[in-house]
Swiss-Prot record:
It holds the Pfam family RelA_AH_RIS. GO terms for cellular component: plasma membrane. Residues 450-511 form the TGS domain. It is an enzyme of class 2 (transferase). SUPFAM superfamilies: ACT-like (SSF55021), HD-domain/PDEase-like (SSF109604), Nucleotidyltransferase (SSF81301), TGS-like (SSF81271). InterPro entries: ACT-like_dom_sf, ACT_dom, Beta-grasp_dom_sf, HD/PDEase_dom, HD_domain, NT_sf, RelA/Spo_fam, RelA/SpoT_AH_RIS. It catalyses: GTP + ATP = guanosine 3'-diphosphate 5'-triphosphate + AMP. In eubacteria ppGpp (guanosine 3'-diphosphate 5'-diphosphate) is a mediator of the stringent response that coordinates a variety of cellular activities in response to changes in nutritional abundance. This enzyme catalyzes the formation of pppGpp which is then hydrolyzed to form ppGpp. The lineage of its organism: Bacteria, Bacillati, Actinomycetota, Actinomycetes, Mycobacteriales. Residues 714-788 form the ACT domain. The keyword Nucleotide-binding applies. This is Probable GTP pyrophosphokinase. It comes from the Bacteria. It comes from Mycobacterium bovis (strain ATCC BAA-935 / AF2122/97).
Length: 790
């Protein structure tokens, strides 16, 4: 019935209502008419799309067209309006600025964005590149930028700005790199932008003064290019190295360019012969692959000449060969093909597919004895691996885009960042190294060094610097394993801890279960990994602090007992905390540690404690008396006490003058004071001339020292200033059992320290021995006795 109704409807004459809907309900009368209708609709859709694309192209600034063209190849669905907007903002903000070359400043961020587009970076990164100098060099605020372009762009620009604000230089370099690594952890695109920024600056470096060119080139060669290498950005790394080489060694660069150009014809012929043989054999083996030349870069050639001591004529591998396959299994098959053609060189095969270098780079490397007996380097990898090798971490965003298009994650994408063990290692170092200089030293070492791969007994791979030992291995596994390491077995055999490890060895370490187990100081002589060095240094620094803490407590106890003072009452938590705050130490433990390390004397701390308790005058006198070598009880001084007698007047009170501090052996004279006593002076005293004007008051005095006599002595110490100098001199005097009454130190502009000490001693004959002891202190070049007035 329904079918009849439909048929009737189809042939019935149209009503008024149906006529109004006729275009939508009309059924074609034949297949030909159906096809015509479909073609017409398709043409209308294409026309609309063409008009829309033409309109979009017409709104794109012509300056951006090269950037857009490159970016669209990888990101066909990219939102170009935000790129246009970012360019307009950057152009407006930099409108009044020029580069050193005289070009408008906007050419720089545009060039950086183009470099990043060629690397395959995402739209957000290109937007940040266009804006990366606006916050630093214009009045555009980070808040305004974030509000207009989003939080992600804001984070990237902020990261690049913070790196730019600290110059890579001798003082700040370590801290700058530390900030750079921290920024990488937050978002590695910050460093990718920075590397691209440096690449364009290196390309235009000729417009800067020569000294600035050299400084930037050294920074690039030592830090930026190796970092680009570790991030897998090989193409950028090579260009940075060659540009730096041309600036730092222009004549050597030009000579190598000339030598390479001179070998070009024979090199091209040789390469064509090699490629033909490989292609024919691969085809016969039914392996689908592309074979291409791989030119050596000038800096690489120079390094071989310098590091390996070769002449240019001995460097045969000016051109290597790269084989690009579709599948990993084809890579290993291609190695077999190459080895069947030419004899492989022993020890020159590297499998970076199974063990990726730096967690990013994958390839098979082999060197064979090629045609004419010349060494030939061959790299074999998949096309995906090649993209990663060329662009490194930047390729991660290509994979992200691939996922966005088809919903399937590329096998490399999930692990691209997470597998960068080297980056995680850097983050560990930057947290552990308290000193930025120490961190930079570790970083530079690791950037320059080659690596080996060893295995745990469970088959886990541990990457170590070449020359590493079982101790380096232990610290790479875990800090506590390193601290407690007492032995090792390599490939099932016991070995010494300083034995160097080789590629592919299985390493097992034995650890101590003793609670006080720790590293040996001897390990510092043979470990090579930055992690092991840092951990061992930290362990001994902590141990020294603990020893200094106990030493400081013992020194305080001895000083208090020497003064006959109540230890528990004097050295209590509250009073010690007050003194620690007064002396600007964090807590009581820090104060004890400072005492143990000699930064502050126990006697000084005791004096501060006494002052806190309000009894400083009386207690200090008692402390000074009991700390002298004399064992006799204190009593009022008589003529015998000062060691001077007055002929014919045995009961007269005598006193040693403080202006010249005479001691037995000095030529002396007496001066009758208005109180009836006698003041004893050296005859060469600075006051002697004025005293002798009153000749009637000058009398004869003689030395008559007794075992209880105590004399004041002043000495001057001249030394080259250094850390803990005063502490070492004071300790030398204390070892001679003298009681220091006063000390003063001045340091001149040429770092010469002049110290003056006044102390009591019982036997002046001992003075020569004391002066020799002070002369033996490191840095002291003169010490002699002086008068107080001198």
């Amino acid at each position: 019935m329904a079918e009849d109704q439909l048929t009737a409807q189809a042939v019935a004459p149209p009503t008024e209502a149906s006529a109004a809907l006729e275009p939508a309900l009309e059924t074609p009368e034949s297949p030909v008419e159906t096809l015509k209708t479909s073609i017409s609709a398709s043409r209308r859709v294409r026309a609309r799309l063409a008009r829309r694309m033409t309109a979009q192209r017409s709104t794109t600034n012509p300056v951006l067209e090269p950037l857009v063209a490159v970016h669209r190849e990888i990101y066909p669905k990219a939102d170009l309006s935000i790129l246009q907007r970012a360019y307009e903002v950057a152009d407006q903000r930099h409108a009044s600025q020029l580069r050193q070359s005289g070009d408008p400043y906007i050419t720089h961020p545009l060039a950086v964005a183009n470099i990043l587009a060629e690397l395959g970076m995402d739209t957000t990164t290109l937007v940040a590149a266009l804006l990366h100098d606006t916050v630093e060099d214009t009045g555009y605020t980070l808040e305004a930028l974030t509000e207009e372009f989003g939080e992600e762009v804001g984070h990237l620009v902020d990261g690049v700005t913070k790196l730019d604000r600290v110059v890579l230089g001798s003082a700040a370099e370590g801290e700058t790199i530390r900030k750079m690594i921290t920024a990488m952890a937050r978002d590695p695109r910050v460093l990718v932008i920075k590397v691209a920024d440096r690449l364009h600056n290196m390309r235009t470096m000729r417009f800067l003064p020569p000294e600035k060119q050299a400084r930037k080139a050294r920074e690039t060669l030592e830090v930026i290019a190796p970092l680009a290498h570790r991030l897998g950005m090989a193409s950028v790394k090579w260009e940075l190295e060659d540009l730096s080489f041309a600036i730092l060694h222009p004549k050597k660069y030009e000579e190598i360019v000339r030598l390479v150009a001179g070998r070009a014809p024979s090199r091209d012929t040789y390469l064509a012969k090699v490629r033909a043989e490989i292609v024919n054999t691969l085809t016969a083996s039914k392996i689908k692959a592309t074979v291409e030349g791989r030119p050596k870069h000038y800096w690489s050639i120079y390094q071989k000449m310098i590091v390996k001591g070769r002449d240019f004529d001995d460097i045969h591998d000016l051109v290597g060969v790269r084989i690009l396959c579709d599948e990993i299994r084809d890579c290993y098959a291609a190695v077999g093909v190459v080895h069947s053609l030419w004899q492989p060189m022993a020890g020159r095969f590297k499998d970076y597919i199974a063990q990726p270098r730096y967690g990013v780079y994958q390839s098979l490397h082999t060197t064979v004895v090629g045609p004419e007996g010349k060494p030939l380097e061959v790299q074999i990898r998949t096309r995906d691996m090649h993209r990663t090798a060329e662009y490194g971490i930047a390729a991660h965003w290509r994979y992200k885009e691939a996922k966005g298009r088809n919903g399937v994650l590329h096998p490399h994408a999930a692990a691209e960042i997470d597998d960068m063990a080297w980056m995680r290692q850097l983050l560990d170092w930057q947290r552990e190294a308290a000193d930025p200089g120490e961190f930079l030293e570790s970083l530079r070492y690791d950037l320059a060094v080659q690596e080996i791969f060893v295995f745990t007994p469970k088959g886990d791979v541990i990457t170590l610097p070449t020359g590493s030992t079982p101790v380096d291995f232990a610290y790479a596994v875990h800090t506590e394993v390193g601290h407690r390491c007492i032995g090792a077995r390599v490939n099932g055999r016991l070995v010494a801890l300083e034995r160097k490890l080789e590629n592919g060895e299985v390493v097992e370490v034995f650890t101590s279960k003793a609670p006080n187990a720790g590293p040996s100081r001897d390990w510092q002589q043979f470990v090579v990994s930055p992690r092991a060095k840092t951990k061992i240094r930290q362990w001994f620094a902590k141990e020294r602090r603990e020893e200094a803490l106990e030493t400081g407590k013992d020194a305080m106890a001895r000083e208090v007992r020497r003064g006959g003072l109540p230890l528990q009452r004097l050295v209590n938590g509250e009073s010690m905390a007050a003194v620690a705050r007064e002396l600007h130490y964090a807590d009581v433990s820090a104060l004890y540690t400072a005492i143990g390390e000699g930064h502050v004397s126990a006697k000084h701390v005791v004096q501060r404690l006494l002052a806190e308790l309000g009894g400083i005058d009386q207690a200090e006198e008692e402390l000074a008396e009991r700390s002298t070598p004399a064992t006799m009880p204190r009593r009022p001084r008589s003529t015998d006490d000062v060691g001077v007698s007055v002929p014919g007047a045995p009961g007269v009170l005598t006193k040693l003058a403080k202006c010249c501090t005479p001691v037995p052996g000095d030529v002396i004279m007496g001066f009758v004071t208005r109180g009836g006593g006698v003041s004893v002076h050296r005859t060469d005293c600075t006051n002697a001339a004025s005293l002798q004007q009153q000749a009637e008051r000058i009398i004869e005095v003689l030395w008559a020292p007794s075992p209880s006599s105590v004399f004041l002595v002043a000495i001057q110490v001249e030394a080259l200033d250094r850390h803990r100098l005063l502490s070492d001199v004071t300790r030398a005097l204390a070892d001679e059992k003298v009681n220091i009454l006063s000390a003063s130190v001045t340091t001149s502009g040429d770092r010469v320290a002049i110290s003056r000490f006044t102390f009591e001693m019982g036997d002046p004959k001992h003075l020569g021995h004391l002066l020799n002891a002070v002369r033996n202190v490191e840095g002291v070049y003169d010490v002699y006795r002086v008068t107080s007035a001198a």
